């Protein structure tokens, strides 16, 4: 790892440079991340996350790992599902995002363990969690295969991985979606977050992310069984689910 080339949006960079460049993006957008999510998706990200939470079928006392948990939307939902006897870890590789998420949850009276963690080298034991989730984070990881194998490792047998991520939209809508992503989104980033470049990268990173079938195969290759996905909003996002047997 490290000597090869990879993509950073539409640009090509050394593999060992990508993580630092992605970190710069999320340090920049952290404070405005929630409001930009609402503006960018017209609030739909809340619906997508709500669906994800209801898909999990958690029970009281379960253990959950929220990878790239950012500002804590999923962690909040998981904590309500598993109760005080459960365990939910909010993790992110970016300290700015993790701080915003931790503080936001504290302001709501919710105390959860947090960890500044790299998904490709998770600091958790084997066979520990009932559920691992990653929402809008996998596409930013340099070594996605390694991250998926780590998620598999920390899951208990019978545990579930949920990957909520931007995906490939239905073909008839591609033109309109491209116009929105590459013309309007950077303008909104400049006006609201004073940062057009970061939102240009986010739009480009979506286009470079594996499509639904490719990600399904990647999860199978990482060891998961019963892998399937559910498209939402005409394929703008997809929720992939895999089980460790």
Curated annotation (Swiss-Prot):
Q: Which residues form a coiled coil?
A: none
Please give the biological process terms from Gene Ontology that the record holds.
Answer: aerobic respiration; menaquinone biosynthetic process; methylation
Q: What is its EC number?
A: 2.1.1.163, 2.1.1.201
- Give the catalytic activity: a 2-demethylmenaquinol + S-adenosyl-L-methionine = a menaquinol + S-adenosyl-L-homocysteine + H(+); a 2-methoxy-6-(all-trans-polyprenyl)benzene-1,4-diol + S-adenosyl-L-methionine = a 5-methoxy-2-methyl-3-(all-trans-polyprenyl)benzene-1,4-diol + S-adenosyl-L-homocysteine + H(+)
Pathway info: Quinol/quinone metabolism; menaquinone biosynthesis; menaquinol from 1,4-dihydroxy-2-naphthoate: step 2/2; Cofactor biosynthesis; ubiquinone biosynthesis
Q: Which Gene3D superfamilies match?
A: Vaccinia Virus protein VP39
| Residue numbers binding S-adenosyl-L-methionine | 71, 92, 118-119
Q: Specify the enzyme's EC class, one word.
A: transferase
GO MF annotation, one: 2-methoxy-6-polyprenyl-1,4-benzoquinol methyltransferase activity
Query: Does the record bear Protease in its keywords?
Result: no
> Which of UniProt's keywords are assigned here?
Menaquinone biosynthesis, Methyltransferase, S-adenosyl-L-methionine, Transferase, Ubiquinone biosynthesis
What function does the entry list?
Answer: Methyltransferase required for the conversion of demethylmenaquinol (DMKH2) to menaquinol (MKH2) and the conversion of 2-polyprenyl-6-methoxy-1,4-benzoquinol (DDMQH2) to 2-polyprenyl-3-methyl-6-methoxy-1,4-benzoquinol (DMQH2).
Q: Give the family, as the similarity comment puts it.
A: Belongs to the class I-like SAM-binding methyltransferase superfamily. MenG/UbiE family.
| Protein name per Swiss-Prot or TrEMBL | Ubiquinone/menaquinone biosynthesis C-methyltransferase UbiE
Q: What is the lineage of its organism?
A: Bacteria, Pseudomonadati, Pseudomonadota, Betaproteobacteria, Neisseriales
